[in-house]
Amino acid sequence: MDKTLKLLILCLAWTCSFSALRCAARTYPPVATNQDQVIKFTTEGATSQSYKQFIEALRQRLTGGLIHDIPVLPDPTTVEERNRYITVELSNSERESIEVGIDVTNAYVVAYRAGSQSYFLRDAPASASTYLFPGTQRYSLRFDGSYGDLERWAHQTREEISLGLQALTHAISFLRSGASNDEEKARTLIVIIQMASEAARYRYISNRVGVSIRTGTAFQPDPAMLSLENNWDNLSGGVQQSVQDTFPNNVILSSINRQPVVVDSLSHPTVAVLALMLFVCNPPNANQSPLLIRSIVEESKICSSRYEPTVRIGGRDGMCVDVYDDGYHNGNRIIAWKCKDRLEENQLWTLKSDKTIRSNGKCLTTEGYAPGNYVMIYDCTSAVAEATYWEIWDNGTIINPKSALVLSAESSSMGGTLTVQTNEYLMRQGWRTGNNTSPFVTSISGYSDLCMQAQGSNVWLADCDNNKKEQQWALYTDGSIRSVQNTNNCLTSKDHKQGSPIVLMACSNGWASQRWLFKNDGSIYNLHDDMVMDVKRSDPSLKEIILHPYHGKPNQIWLTLF
């Protein structure tokens, strides 16, 4: 009897262990192989929704983990060659189809199959021809996959090549035909790369394609789209190598009007258009996503921690953290002051690896650990060490770990002394690092591709029109969203409860209901209330945007349109 019981217990333990291992394995999605189910998209009867589902499936297959809550491709050093490629089947209304091979380590198109023949870009990895399209007759194309080479062979730039369903339908038919026209091959591959790979990388680009499908109109890439395509590696590197919310190098994008957009911080609103990053390195001591298996994380490249950026710190009403009157004597107060036209010492702060924040070699220091204590400049060696330590969170909060209090600009007046306060995610407690502290001006697209529009103190959705001032919004360093018609008015939830309408109210109080975070899931998130902006009942005719718990449906998805 005892032996039987022991045997039963042993079997149960083995079963539970195996089950636990199996369940744990499910936590980590396997890297896709070209033998897995092919992702498909057809232009026949295509809708913006079917295209969205295709892009979401492609993103999911390409995702290897999360860094700073943003999906990232697998680290190339952890991917076996046999698992390096996935295939996408594209078909058109004439029932012609091709398969496209994509490298999971960079989301590049490396080859395509047309019937019994396959064609590999000149710079395709050597292993691509081994693992992609077995049993086909293989050919090497005369050009590589870079836009520079593709444009040379196409005798057209990306700006000159139309995108949309008609262009994709033609691309499928032409490549399926096996015609030997290299110029047209290059042109059609530019179409496919942008409508698949680039759309998987950026929400902005997938949105442009989706609008094109919904309206039945072709489009050419605008300057904003091209600048995103040209800076994917830079944006990915900026996010992953960021120190205390700050990029190691500015990333210069372009607006649709060809105005420079300087992205220098994780909390910059444009980072939210990234849907999928190139893997560059793992941030040191970062909390890794559960998608990343521990052994893989340990083998992955770790970002350098030696970088110590010197930057401005922008906050309430776009003012800068400033050493009062350029005085560096111990105990001199720190104030909020208009950011100067030139970079000057008393508004420049070095974010040190020891968690101190220094100006002219002296430390930003809290006078004490009670709410309301003022913040001062102090000699780093003689100050109480814990009073000089700060963490800058991805959401723009600057916190003193010892006290758990946050940096706050309680006064709306220029020259107001900065203090530490209980963290309530107030607008006056929001900050953004970087030397470009100007508001980012953009339109904001939402449900049914309509744009957010100010109408007096009300806010609703209307047909997008770049020329309408009512649809232009200034996104400030404090997390506020302001109508460019009157930047003293902020988007504000009337109350802290579900269903509260979003309206325009005076920014002067710096409330929590006026601080917003653009997230990579497409939501505009209120940190204090843990809710997001929501088009009421998914019905723009109600002319009401409300506060609502996040569920991820289309009426909660927003996008800055540069």
UniProtKB/Swiss-Prot annotation:
1-alpha repeats lie at residues 317-359. It is an enzyme of class 3 (hydrolase). Glycans are attached at residues 234, 395, 435. It catalyses: Endohydrolysis of the N-glycosidic bond at one specific adenosine on the 28S rRNA. Disulfide bonds join 281-303, 320-339, 363-380, 451-464, 490-507. The keyword Glycoprotein applies. The active site is at residue 198. The keyword Ribosomal protein does not apply. GO terms for biological process: defense response; negative regulation of translation. 2-beta repeats lie at residues 487-526. It comes from the Eukaryota. Its EC number is 3.2.2.22. InterPro entries: Ribosome-inact_prot_sf, Ribosome_inactivat_1/2, Ribosome_inactivat_prot, Ribosome_inactivat_prot_CS, Ribosome_inactivat_prot_sub1, Ribosome_inactivat_prot_sub2, Ricin_B-like_lectins, Ricin_B_lectin. GO terms for molecular function: carbohydrate binding; rRNA N-glycosylase activity; toxin activity. Residues 1-34 form the signal peptide. Gene3D superfamilies: 2.80.10.50, Ricin (A subunit), domain 1, Ricin (A Subunit), domain 2. It holds the Pfam family Ricin_B_lectin. Residues 307-434, 437-561 form the Ricin B-type lectin domain. 1-beta repeats lie at residues 360-400. Disulfide-linked dimer of A and B chains. The A chain is responsible for inhibiting protein synthesis through the catalytic inactivation of 60S ribosomal subunits by removing adenine from position 4,324 of 28S rRNA. Abrin-a is more toxic than ricin. The B chain is a galactose-specific lectin that facilitates the binding of abrin to the cell membrane that precedes endocytosis. The B chain is composed of two domains, each domain consists of 3 homologous subdomains (alpha, beta, gamma). In the N-terminal section; belongs to the ribosome-inactivating protein family. Type 2 RIP subfamily. This is Abrin-c.
